[in-house]
């Protein structure tokens, strides 16, 4: 059952609406409070071009995976939003707000710390060692808080127990973003990969960092060839 105040936009317990922060093709994101805590509400949009039953099943499946990923990471103290509430019927999810700036803005403003990209690589490896791939790892979905801690956000395309290809693809998505949007930082992806390898530990059933970076190189070369 939906808690009162979720969809109304009227301040009310447990969700108190403040402002809309993003209107995208996939979802509408609003800022507010959940039981007095700073929170973000993501409401997934139906796809008009899709069969309604199929769209509903796909949306529920994606939301279930996103919720599972966030819950898993939360239990393991991974730097990502905390999961507050999920409503599969209304296609919405409420998570904690991460204060700070997207890596995109930090890099655009020229305020990137010397070891930041290496630490980003370490966070990505830590994500993978927790059995999760991100699926949309751009500099908009990497946050740096006021203390300099790095967080990953927006797990709408995440996978649980991902295959090697998914892990390599995470690095490739970030590589494409760095190349297209941050060309003023040459060699950025190499710093990320260095941090990815440096953080690596041996985890059962998780491909080691060498295999992942090798697959990333294969994907990158494949894209260059096709391009």
What are these regions, as identified by a protein language model?
Residues 59-63, 74, 78-120:
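Conserved structural core of kinase catalytic domains
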Residues 17-64:
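ATP-binding glycine-rich loop module of kinase domains
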Residues 141-152:
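Conserved protein kinase catalytic/activation segment
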Residues 129-139:
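Catalytic-loop of the protein kinase fold
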């Amino acid at each position: 059952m939906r808690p009162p105040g979720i969809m109304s936009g009227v301040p009310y317990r447990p969700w108190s609406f403040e402002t809309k922060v993003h209107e995208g093709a996939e979802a509408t994101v609003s800022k507010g409070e959940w039981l007095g805590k700073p929170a973000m509400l993501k409401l997934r949009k139906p796809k008009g071009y899709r069969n309604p039953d199929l769209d509903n099943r796909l949306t529920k499946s994606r939301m279930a995976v996103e919720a599972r990923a966030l819950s898993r990471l939360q239990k393991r103290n991974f730097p990502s939003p905390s999961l507050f509430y999920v409503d599969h019927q209304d296609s919405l999810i409420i998570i904690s707000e991460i204060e700070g700036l997207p890596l995109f803005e930090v890099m655009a403003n020229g305020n990137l710390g010397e070891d930041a990209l290496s630490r980003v690589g370490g966070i990505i490896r830590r994500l993978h060692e927790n059995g999760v791939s991100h699926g949309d790892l751009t500099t908009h979905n990497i946050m740096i808080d006021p203390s300099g801690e790095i967080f990953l956000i927006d797990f709408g395309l995440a996978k649980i127990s991902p295959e090697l290809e998914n892990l390599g693809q995470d690095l490739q998505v970030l590589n494409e973003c760095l190349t297209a949007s941050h060309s003023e930082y040459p060699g950025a992806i190499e710093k990320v990969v260095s941090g990815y390898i440096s953080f690596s530990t041996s985890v059962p059933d998780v491909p080691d960092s060498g295999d992942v970076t090798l697959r990333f190189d294969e994907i990158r070369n494949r894209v260059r060839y096709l391009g």
